[in-house]
Every structure is written in structure tokens, then in C-alpha cells.
Amino acid sequence: DAMLRTDFNITTGFHTDDIPRIKFKSKMKEFYTKAGIPVAKHHMVDTLEGCQKFIKEVGYPVVAKPDNGVGASHTFKIESDEQLATFFAEKWDETIYIMEEYVYGEVNSYDAIIDSNGVPMFETGNVTPASIMDVVNNEDDSLFYIVKDLPDDVRKVGRATIESFGVKSRFVHFEFFRLLEDHEGLGKKGDVMALEVNMRPCGGFTPDMINFAHSTDVYKIWAD
């Protein structure tokens, strides 16, 4: 849809030159920081020596994942030099990876339908107690639930993210970590920090779960 807007100069949403900051995890960090939301330290994967230097700074474990990826696909939790070597042996050569310090946190999302002026028409969120990365890598069961009342801190960072990224006329799914322990440079236990943005609804049956949880119809809200 961004290409169509660009080709026909439609100004109701993102154009093609906006795509990098909403698709690449490394590009998102600038706009989270602009919104005053903490982000994990990162390193763009280059050489083994370059990654070792980054790990020396932040310590094990670290996470390596495609800079442009979804659903924790081909994501590695690296806890030792041996696992780092395994990552370099198994990573896709044509894919750009980002490496980040590991964060002990619970995923809290901000899900909202944004109008043409960048104002939320509907807001909710979900909590994922189990790490999506672990679910994918360990083939575990997936578990998450829709919150009845969106926490004030998630609402605050969600709205700040809307403004920073310049979101209009979208159904969005923004992900944040709620820290499970104090983390130097990121915050205290219970604080909220950035994970990633998705300029689309949360996947699977989540829109239907939202409808049941809130006795609403997000499809109708979006259509209106």
C-alpha cells in the first residue's frame, strides 16, 4: 500500500521512503529513542571479532535475529562462545542480522486503531508471559491474553510511539518489554522499554480475541 500511495501521491499514510523505519529493527530504535523510550544496546552483525567485542561490552547472553524479520523466525539466543560459533555457521549469508543485549522481560503490547489525524480510536493490549523466541525455538505452546484494562504506562509509551513514528490510519501492534529485573541503562523491574513496532494488527486470532474480551468489533471500527 505504501507503493501505491507513493505512485499516486496519496498522503493518507506511509510512502515507500517511510518503510525502513517501520520494517528494520535497527531503524526503529532511533524513533523509540526520540519518543523517550529506552532501547536495548545493539550491534549489526559483521564479523566474529566484531560480535565478540560487542559481547565483551554487554556480556552473555545476547540475541541475534534478522534485522527485517517477523515472528522470531531464525532468532538465536547466544549464551557462550560455542553458541556464537554455531550462530555464524548457521546464519543465512544473504540476511542482515542485528545482535542485542538480552533483556529479561515480559512482552506487553499496545494494540490500537489510529484515525487519519494520528489519534487512537480504540486501544487495548496483550501480555505474553512466555517468550515468543523460546516458543519458536523450543516448539513450546504459545500463551497470551488480552488485558481488560490497558496499563497507564503502556498507554503512555504506545501513544508516544504513534507520535514519534507519525502513524495515521493504521491498525497497529506495538511490542514492549516489561522488565522482570533491574537492567542497567534500561530501567528498574516493572519498567517498560521498547521492543518493536508492527504497523498491522497482531497476528492469528488476536483481533477476534480482542472482540470477545471487549465486547466490540475491531473490524467495524477499522472499516469506519
Locations of regions flagged by a protein language model:
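A short, flexible beta-alpha/helix-coil linker loop
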Residues: 11, 68-71, 200-203
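ATP-dependent carboxylate/phosphate-activation module, predominantly the ATP-grasp catalytic core
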Residues: 101-167, 171, 178-182, 186-189, ...
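Short glycine-/acidic-enriched loop or helix-start segments at secondary-structure transitions
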Residues: 1-3, 73-74, 109, 206
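Short, acidic/turn-prone active-site loops that include or flank metal/cofactor-
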Residues: 16-21, 127-128
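Short polybasic/polar patches that bind polyanions
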Residues: 6, 33, 56, 163, ...
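ATP-binding N-terminal substructure of ATP-dependent carboxylate-amine bond-forming enzymes
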Residues: 1-17, 49
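Active-site nucleotide/adenylate-binding loops and adjacent lid/helix of ATP-dependent enzymes
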Residues: 21-105, 115-119, 141-156
